[in-house]
């Protein structure tokens, strides 16, 4: 993760964006040179740039289960502590019982239509829907969920400017 990603600058008024694990993972695992290399998927590069802009504006948010996914499977204690320290700069959106219930409803709605997803994905959808905030993700499953759920996906180009 680049130094710009580790600190939040001026928190400007504006909509917060719930960032999915996939985007955080892309930004955290790439070295700055790799994030702009021609061999990198252009969508991934755009997502990393979008996250960087959201972080700079103080609008990037997460939920606890995303934090857990990011911290799970870290190979060394030092890497874990470093990542934990970076992520501590970002608040978790507090979750309520209604978020879990809505996530279960979303899971059932999508499953009835043949669309599968993870519990974390549906919790992200529920939190974003209930709070009327967009989701930033490179995971194509979210486009499928959007067909059946009241969620908004943030196009990468809308973040900048």
Q: Model-flagged regions — what are they?
A:
Residues 1-62, 72-85, 159-161:
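Short, well-structured N-terminal submotif of metal-dependent ribonuclease cores
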Residues 2-16, 91-136:
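Active-site neighborhoods of divalent-metal-dependent phosphate/nucleic-acid chemistry enzymes
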Residues 24, 67-70, 142:
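A generic structural signal for short hydrophobic patches within well-formed alpha-helices
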Residues 48, 63, 67, 80-83, ...:
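A general structural signal for well-ordered alpha-helical segments in protein cores
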Residues 77, 139-141:
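Short, polar loop motifs at secondary-structure junctions
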Residues 143-148:
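Short loop/helix-cap segments at secondary-structure boundaries that form the rim of catalytic
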Residues 150-158:
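Short beta-strand->loop
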């Amino acid at each position: 993760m680049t130094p710009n990603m580790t600190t939040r600058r001026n928190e400007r008024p504006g909509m917060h964006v719930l960032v999915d694990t996939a985007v955080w993972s892309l930004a955290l695992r790439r070295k700055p040179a790799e994030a702009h290399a021609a061999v990198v998927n252009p969508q991934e590069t755009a997502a990393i740039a979008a996250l960087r802009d959201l972080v700079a504006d103080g609008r990037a948010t997460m939920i606890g289960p995303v934090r857990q996914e990011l911290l799970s499977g870290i190979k060394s204690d030092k890497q874990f502590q470093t990542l934990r320290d970076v992520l501590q700069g970002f608040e978790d959106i507090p979750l309520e019982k209604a978020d879990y219930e809505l996530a279960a409803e979303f899971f059932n709605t999508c499953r009835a239509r043949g669309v599968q997803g993870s519990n974390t994905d549906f919790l992200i959808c529920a939190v974003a829907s209930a709070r009327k905030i967009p989701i930033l993700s490179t995971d194509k499953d979210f486009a499928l969920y959007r067909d059946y759920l009241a969620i908004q996906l943030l196009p990468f180009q809308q973040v900048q400017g």
